Amino acid sequence: MGHAAGASAQIAPVVGIIANPISARDIRRVIANANSLQLADRVNIVLRLLAALASCGVERVLMMPDREGLRVMLARHLARRQGPDSGLPAVDYLDMPVTARVDDTLRAARCMADAGVAAIIVLGGDGTHRAVVRECGAVPIAGLSTGTNNAYPEMREPTIIGLATGLYATGRIPPAQALASNKRLDIVIRDGNGGFRRDIALVDAVISHEHFIGARALWKTDTLAAVYVSFADPEAIGLSSIAGLLEPVGRREEGGLAIELAAPGEGEFDLCAPIAPGLMCTVPVAGWQRLEHGRPHRVRQRSGIVALDGERELAFGPDDEVTVTLHDHAFRSIDVAACMRHAGRHHLMRSLPQPAAVG
């Protein structure tokens, strides 16, 4: 459908939407001065996406089901036959169990890729986008930030994201102009028996001295041992901001950054960074170096926790070996800015005036 599997554009492409109904509700919102996105706000975002997709000729959207009320509230709007909510694409929901855990996002991304969607629009923070990328394969994603940490998804009006995605999905912008390559961090933990565990991060992998996962969100900087980033934006919020304010690395630039942290008073210098909205923390920096594509970097810490894109995920012990490897060109995303420039330069949103109705 659309550009899926490299095929030429078809008449009725399908776009997937994965909206995390509970993003931006973790402990970082409690300890910092940050708001949570309400359910009605999420519904309004989806409606704006649908309106933009409809204007591009997308007639069908596939969504992840939920049990938080988003589906019910959205259905009320879609049932209207008049007004701004009329004429929107048909919304179908995946036939899948709902657990209200990250498993839903993983399963939905996998099902949408299997269904041949042209693209997947993701509403969530870094953790939600990471889960989608794990399972979406070659399907490009369009990120929309609705989480606490939003270093990966850029801040944009949903209508514009919907337009860019719709123009690509319907074949009006070719992949060479519409898509961008993104970096990824691969984390591998090998044990003494030859077994291994593997996971990914889109933005940052952080090593903590802690030994229990507990609350998944990581925000206490005095427990940090090392920070690895695929890119580092000095305007970002979250653990990647440490790298962004130390040595910025562009998201399209090759390579990443590895930072070793020290105990208080023992680093080369202290760095103040915004770890969560409204939460400024100081971290002692011991040293840093660039990460090169495809070259594994061995973690020095003997035991602890690996947090991926801000959330504790993996525990390791003294008999384990942990490596972090950066990969350039790991997955594709909709380049919204490039799509909109292409649309303007090639007059994609123009049409001839329709004759006025007589009588």
From Swiss-Prot:
Alphabetical UniProt keywords: Acetoin catabolism, Cell membrane, Membrane
Biological process according to GO? acetoin catabolic process; NADP biosynthetic process
Functional pathway: Ketone degradation; acetoin degradation
Check the record and name the Gene3D superfamilies matching this protein.
Probable inorganic polyphosphate/atp-NAD kinase, domain 1
SUPFAM superfamilies for the chain: NAD kinase/diacylglycerol kinase-like
Q: Which InterPro entries match?
A: AcoX-like (IPR039065), AcoX_kinase (IPR011391), ATP-NAD_kinase_N (IPR017438), NAD/diacylglycerol_kinase_sf (IPR016064), NADK (IPR002504)
Q: Where is this protein localized, as stated in its record?
A: Cell membrane
Q: Name one GO molecular function term.
A: NAD binding
Q: Which domain of life is it from?
A: Bacteria
GO CC annotations? Answer: plasma membrane
Q: What does this protein do?
A: Essential for acetoin catabolism.
What is this protein called in UniProt?
A: Acetoin catabolism protein X
Species lineage, top-down? Answer: Bacteria, Pseudomonadati, Pseudomonadota, Betaproteobacteria, Burkholderiales
Gene encoding the protein: acoX
